[in-house]
Amino acid sequence: MRLLQPRRVGGSECDWVAMIDVSSELARGCGSTAWNWANWAVHHWMLALWPRQCQDEVWGDDPSVLIASAILFPPGKAVRVDGGYRLSGRWPFSSGVDACAWDMMGAVVEGTGELRMFVVPREDYRVIDNWHVLGLRGTGSKDVECKDVFVAEHRTLAVDATKGGATHPGAASNPGPIFRIPLFAALPHMLIGIPLGIAQGAYEIFLEGLQARMSRYSGRSLADMTAVQMKVAEASASIDAARLVLRRSCIAAQEIAERNEAPDLMTKVTWRRDGAFAAQLCERAMDVIYKSAGATGLYDDQPLQRCYRDLHAANAHISMMWDAQATTYGRVALGLPCDNPTL
């Protein structure tokens, strides 16, 4: 969980590509476990961008404390008051929230339209038990709600301060390169390891099962069938291609940060495009595997059906939705204004 946390508080502060490598390995076994781990790990990295006072309040007693998030802006309303903001709203998809002592929430500041994020303690928000879903059931990604909660200024962070470089208020305390990586441009890297790992795990299950399976009609070994061999190749190529694309983006983000530079807009939308494209490659692999598994994959006691559900649930995340990310990339590539204000 402390993979990206600053070393000064006992974290590992690993290179950015570690998010892909570790989360995908966890997801080979369980997509929900990997999803929550990735969220909790990334929130320690994100907190390093906040003012030092906020970091000390959250990490002070327990640097391994768990932090959830619900960083969607339209559901939240923030009103500027003396010393901070009054925050209200109801946010969906706060993954792993039941185990957490804090939550990060997004809101639009009334009057200015500014996008801002807020760190809120457990006693100031309500968890709503409504995560009854098809896939990633184990994440407990429930709604959270605040009603006119005061949030001190130092527990808030403007989105404009997170667009790359040492422009955020935590830069002096956390000067490492990974804390100069732009938050929302790198969003795909935070979670895309999960569909990658799910697809890899499903591929391994599929491959192992083929060794002993015989056709119930012809009696032939499935492994001897040319069509099955081609499906194995297609699935593995899709997974390998996704991994290469994702690791390339992560390594590029790390290298730019190590040069103490911020990526330009075209680079940012390319990372978002590549993340969504990699997600589609993982989905392609999963669909090939599941269809090729036949009716065996329908049973509840077969892990392939959980892999199928979990991967499709993961790919419903906005950062992995191809149409949304491709549109943003296409606009910027064609010289039109970017439609994503967080970049």
Regions found by a protein language model. Name each.
Residues M1-C100:
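Glycine-rich flavin
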Residues R90-Y125, D129-N130:
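DPxDG-like acidic metal-binding loop motif
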Residues G135, D143-I239:
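Glycine-rich beta->alpha junctions and the first turn(s) of the following alpha-helix
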Residues G197, A233-D240, R272, A276-E283, ...:
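Generic structural signal for well-ordered, non-transmembrane alpha-helical segments
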Residues E208-L210, V245-R248, R284:
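Extended, amphipathic, non-transmembrane alpha-helical segments
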Residues D240-F277, Y290-L298:
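C-terminal helix-coil-helix/basic helical segment that borders enzyme active sites and/or dimer interfaces
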Residues R284-K291, W322-A326:
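Short segments within alpha-helical structural elements
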Residues A295-L343:
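Glycine-rich phosphate/cofactor-binding loops in nucleotide/flavin-utilizing enzymes
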